Swiss-Prot record:
It comes from Anoxybacillus flavithermus (strain DSM 21510 / WK1). One of its GO terms (cellular component) is cytoplasm. This is D-aminoacyl-tRNA deacylase. PANTHER family: D-AMINOACYL-TRNA DEACYLASE 1, D-TYROSYL-TRNA TYR DEACYLASE. It is found in: Cytoplasm. Belongs to the DTD family.
Length: 146
């Protein structure tokens, strides 16, 4: 499992011109799933992200978590995170999970975050989406399960 984590002042995702998910403050997650990812991977990554100390404390030091600041998450499924660009000029997506498996793990991941008391907004799995955000910092990290 591979997740790009972006700290955001605000973010929204639209499908066919309609807003389907929106947050005011928190994290935007681009979530990629590979073939052998499990619900345990989803739980590990969800816990890691929920407790990452990437928000500033009163001294301006990155020292508090999303849970500490009461932020929300905009979670977007993105199979292209497993695109292999080493050969040729066209990415190979063979490492991305099949849609049925990916959707199951993606939904389990979002549920793990919700169980921690985090408000989670999502896009539409498998849809063409427009994602807009204001990245604060900017702070962008990659969290992987393996």
């Amino acid at each position: 499992m591979r997740v790009v984590v972006q700290r955001a002042k605000d973010a929204k995702v639209t499908v066919a011109g309609e807003v389907v998910g929106e947050i005011d403050f928190g994290l935007v997650l681009l979530v990629g799933i590979t073939h052998d990812d499990t619900e345990e991977d989803a739980a590990f990554v969800a816990d890691k992200i929920a407790h990452l100390r990437i928000f500033e404390d009163e001294h301006g030091k990155m020292n508090v978590s999303l849970i500490d600041v009461g932020g929300a998450i905009l979670s977007i499924s993105q199979f292209t995170l497993y695109g292999d660009c080493r050969k040729g000029r066209r990415p190979n997506f063979m490492d991305a999970a099949k849609p049925e498996h990916a959707k199951h793990i993606y939904e389990a991941f979002n549920e793990q975050l919700r169980q921690k008391g985090i408000r989670v907004e999502t896009g539409v799995f498998g849809a063409m989406m427009d994602v807009m955000l204001t990245n604060v910092g900017p702070v962008t990290l990659i969290v992987e399960s393996k």
